């Protein structure tokens, strides 16, 4: 699913102007004495909505006044992505904010964190615990390893985001610094910290990362992706 592409300035405006909400789920006993506000949903003895709308209702419960509140944020500006119509595999525990693009047959593993404005290309896998910061872009058929970080850039608005090309492998726990571009076909070794742009079809490693060789047949075999993992 392709979200509308937003510039840094548009993202800043989106967050700044958004109504801040503390969404809660409240299970209560007793009866409500007041009418429900329009934006509060009641299913049986469970309420869903913003705490500022629900709190007054709970203050006026009749009979039994017991209730339990479940919440996962406070004054949140950006909701989580609605994943129902995305043609990709997204495992439980992935945290994906709204205004993220996830193309067909991509894979997002448990524990991955994807911030607003990020883009994940067709057939790309974001492994466990990887972080894609705001506006980070990954091309097609790439693999971002477990625990890797693609630094986000929302502020300052003039800064360039991280861009990863097609058919790139970023190893576990590697860090790609703000504004860096990694060329298509390249490999970033596990644990590398990439502070400068990486050309196409090379292997980089180290802290800071440096080119150690060009991609050869042996490297291609060791870093080949498995299409079966992307089947839906």
Swiss-Prot record:
Annotated function: Catalyzes the transfer of an acetyl group from acetyl-CoA to tetrahydrodipicolinate.
PANTHER family on file: 2,3,4,5-TETRAHYDROPYRIDINE-2,6-DICARBOXYLATE N-ACETYLTRANSFERASE (PTHR43300:SF10), ACETYLTRANSFERASE (PTHR43300)
Stated name of the protein: 2,3,4,5-tetrahydropyridine-2,6-dicarboxylate N-acetyltransferase
One GO term (biological process): diaminopimelate biosynthetic process
Source organism of this protein record: Streptococcus mutans serotype c (strain ATCC 700610 / UA159)
Enzyme kind, highest EC tier: transferase
Reaction(s) the record says it catalyses: (S)-2,3,4,5-tetrahydrodipicolinate + acetyl-CoA + H2O = L-2-acetamido-6-oxoheptanedioate + CoA
E.C. designation(s): 2.3.1.89
């Amino acid at each position: 699913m392709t979200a509308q592409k937003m510039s840094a300035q548009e993202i800043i405006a989106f967050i700044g102007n958004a109504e801040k909400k503390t969404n809660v789920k409240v299970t209560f006993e007793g009866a409500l004495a007041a009418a429900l506000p329009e934006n509060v949903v009641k299913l049986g003895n469970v309420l869903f909505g913003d705490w500022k709308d629900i709190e007054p209702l709970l203050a006026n419960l009749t009979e039994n006044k017991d209730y339990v509140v479940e919440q996962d944020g406070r004054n949140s500006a950006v909701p989580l992505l609605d994943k129902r119509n995305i043609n990709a595999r997204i495992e439980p525990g992935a945290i994906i904010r709204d205004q993220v693009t996830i193309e067909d047959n991509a894979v997002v593993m448990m524990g991955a964190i994807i911030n607003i404005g990020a883009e994940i290309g067709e057939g790309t896998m974001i492994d466990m615990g990887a972080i894609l910061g705001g506006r980070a872009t990954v091309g097609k058929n790439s693999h971002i390893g477990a625990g890797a970080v693609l630094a986000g850039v929302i502020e300052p608005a003039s800064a360039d985001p991280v861009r990863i090309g097609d058919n790139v492998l970023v190893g576990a726990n590697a860090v790609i610094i703000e504004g860096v571009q990694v060329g298509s076909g390249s490999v970033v070794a596990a644990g590398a910290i990439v502070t400068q742009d990486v050309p196409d079809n090379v292997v980089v490693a180290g802290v800071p990362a440096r080119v150690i060789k060009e991609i050869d047949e042996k490297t291609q075999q060791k870093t080949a992706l498995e299409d079966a993992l992307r089947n839906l």
